[in-house]
Amino acid sequence: MGFALADPPADNCCAGGRNLSEILAYLPVFILILTGLGLLLNLPYRWLLILFSLQFVAAFWLILLSWPLGLAAVKLLVGWMAVAIIGSSINEEESPTDFDWKLNDNFFKIIAGLLILLLAFSLGNTAFQWIPASFAVISGGLVLAGLGLLQLGLSTQPFRTTIGLLTLLSGFDIIYAAVVNSVLVAGLSALVSLGLAFLGAYLMNVEHLEDQP
């Protein structure tokens, strides 16, 4: 007398797949939190550019949940181009040579960043009710937008101001991509991102020339 092994219920398999995809959707949000907080600190410019590049990877990941690969890849490629443009205008002599931990400065930035995260997740829980997107997408976009605004409010340096503006724009792109699927929107966002990068690079060069005797 033989015994046949019963196949696992299809509903359980589908539920397991959905749970895995939901968990993976929160991974880029975690990366955005780490990179966003890291960009607030007094790190060498080279490390800041690496964090900025990783931030665009995580933003691409979240946009990919709403847009097809071709459109989402535009955000990643344009983001890396913006990083290259900004990096080409960096004055290494003005960059910190090591991690510059000023207790009163960086500690305040971390606390302010954590408050922004708390606010972003609180608003995300509310916006989740009326925006047709997952909580990971909404919270990730709000986290980037909030940390970008914080970056703008904490510094007047062209380098950090440009990073703040591009971070804010990335947060907007993540949320807007969940609402509208448009080639025109992707192209317009790319033009604005490159324009901000070129403007930031120009202001960085002007600042460097003014500092020279």
Where are these regions (language model features)?
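Alpha-helical transmembrane segments of multi-pass membrane proteins predominantly involved
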Residues: 13-213
